[in-house]
């Protein structure tokens, strides 16, 4: 596949807000997926005083073929002070909207659900004005784990299907499944989460109709918010799948419009869109606080 199209190139910038965020995170020993997963929007988000925190360590028990996070066995270790430090970072940075995500932790009986709940509660305690979105793993489909997170009261519960049904065995770790992801999202609604959210990457070999099928499945699971972005290979390692194609801007726009017509409350669809892209704007749109439109 050829080099990145012009619309996927992001100018590297460094300014005072970036330095402030890095300094706070370093002193508190907390991590962000913004840098760990090489997100192209890190400059925009940090520049706006927004960050996506990664809890439960930096080692994932799964090896999805789109992700740059390190794979290994954390052997059950959990830093119980981590939720407090994340909340303290939120307080010091004065964040309005916080996304909390994590690696997969198949080595833990609850998949890390308790740590998510603790992080939500600590943020509520130390930064009561902040809105909290969680982007969770699939917890191996455990209803109890989803309930644990939901009971802590996140403003948005997110879990990504990542790709179309046909490509799931190729793209995601063998322990993940398309059906399990849909079940997690449906369960989140059933146990009281007001807003649910999911995301999909394009450029892995899917067809337009397959993406529409995913959108239909997500609506059947009562998902409110959807993000659609371009897959970019994180490294040239054999582990990471090559890009099958660079999806044109027009196709993103068309899929976004299809999603809105299906009844999603908020949609972001563009090459640079990632799970947490303009998360606060999507939240406000889902609540009817801003006009419904495809965010790009």
UniProtKB/Swiss-Prot annotation:
Binds 2 [4Fe-4S] clusters per subunit. One cluster is coordinated with 3 cysteines and an exchangeable S-adenosyl-L-methionine. Its cofactor is [4Fe-4S] cluster. InterPro entries: Aldolase_TIM, Elp3/MiaA/NifB-like_rSAM, Lipoyl_synth, rSAM. Belongs to the radical SAM superfamily. Lipoyl synthase family. The gene is lipA. [4Fe-4S] cluster 1 binds at residues 34, 39, 45, 276. This is Lipoyl synthase. The keyword Lipid metabolism does not apply. SMART domains: Elp3. It comes from Pyrobaculum arsenaticum (strain DSM 13514 / JCM 11321 / PZ6). NCBIfam families: lipA, PRK05481.1, PRK12928.1. One of its GO terms (cellular component) is cytoplasm. Its main location: cytoplasm. PROSITE patterns: RADICAL_SAM (PS51918). Signal peptide: none annotated. Its EC number is 2.8.1.8. Pathway: Protein modification; protein lipoylation via endogenous pathway; protein N(6)-(lipoyl)lysine from octanoyl-[acyl-carrier-protein]: step 2/2. Disulfide bonds: none annotated. [4Fe-4S] cluster 2 binds at residues 60, 64, 67. Residues 46-265 form the Radical SAM core domain.
């Amino acid at each position: 596949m050829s080099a990145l199209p012009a619309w996927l190139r992001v100018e590297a910038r460094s300014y005072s807000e970036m330095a402030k965020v890095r300094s706070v995170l370093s002193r508190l020993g907390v991590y962000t997926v913004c840098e760990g997963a090489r997100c192209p929007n890190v400059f925009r988000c940090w520049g706006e005083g927004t960050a996506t925190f990664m809890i439960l360590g930096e080692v994932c028990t799964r090896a999805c073929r789109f992700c740059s996070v390190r794979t290994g066995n954390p052997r059950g270790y959990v830093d119980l002070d981590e939720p407090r430090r994340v909340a303290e970072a939120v307080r010091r940075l004065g964040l309005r909207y916080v996304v909390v995500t994590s690696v997969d932790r198949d080595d833990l009986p609850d998949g890390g659900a308790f740590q998510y709940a603790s992080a939500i509660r600590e943020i509520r305690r130390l930064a009561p004005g902040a809105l909290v979105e969680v982007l969770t793993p699939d917890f191996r489909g455990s209803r109890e784990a989803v309930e644990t997170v939901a009971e802590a009261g996140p403003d948005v519960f997110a879990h990504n299907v990542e790709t179309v049904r046909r490509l799931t065995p190729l793209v995601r770790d063998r322990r993940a499944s398309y059906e399990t992801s849909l079940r997690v999202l449906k369960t989140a609604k059933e146990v009281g989460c007001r807003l649910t959210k999911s995301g999909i990457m394009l450029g892995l070999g899917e067809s337009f109709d397959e993406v529409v099928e995913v959108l239909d499945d997500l609506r059947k699971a009562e998902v409110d918010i959807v993000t659609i972005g371009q897959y970019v290979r994180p490294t040239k390692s054999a582990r990471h799948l090559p890009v099958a194609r660079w999806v044109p801007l027009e196709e993103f726009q068309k899929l976004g419009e299809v999603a809105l017509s299906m009844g999603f409350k908020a949609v972001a669809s563009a090459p640079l869109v990632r799970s947490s892209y303009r998360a606060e704007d999507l939240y406000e749109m889902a609540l009817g606080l801003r006009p419904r439109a495809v965010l790009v």
